[in-house]
Amino acid sequence: MRGTSAVCWSLLLLIALLSQNVTAKGGRGGARGGARGASRGASRVRLKTSSRYGSLRVASQAAAAGAAARAAARLSENTWRNNDHSGMDTQFGNSTNEGMYSYRAWTSGTCPLSSHLSFRLIISIGAILTCSSSSIYVSTKINLGK
């Protein structure tokens, strides 16, 4: 359960950080800018340092990427460990201990990881799409209201 939630949160953070909307206009714009700038003797072009590589943003992206990589590594490690069929039981025995004839193979709870993971992924993707569509609406409204 912890691994599933770690995977979902890492993917959610990673997608949210990588799909951040950077096209929205920042600062004061529109009619307020007319009272400043050329009318006061300053140059028209104002240089503003880019906050694209701010330390907090870079650190949070690195943490999200590290968490996603760690969760993916743990998930792949567990699948490799569970799919190891090189033992003597599976080669020469009838494989009834954990194989096809076991109780868990015929119940609906065979793989609880996939059901929880799919449910959380659907919820996460829905939240991301909702947030991204609202940010697109806000940025369009800002750009149209120049």
UniProtKB/Swiss-Prot annotation:
It is found in: Cell membrane. It is a lipid-anchor; GPI-anchor. This is Shadow of prion protein. It comes from Xenopus tropicalis (Western clawed frog). InterPro entries: Shadoo. Prion-like protein that has PrP(C)-like neuroprotective activity. Residues 1-24 form the signal peptide. Residues 109-146 form a propeptide.
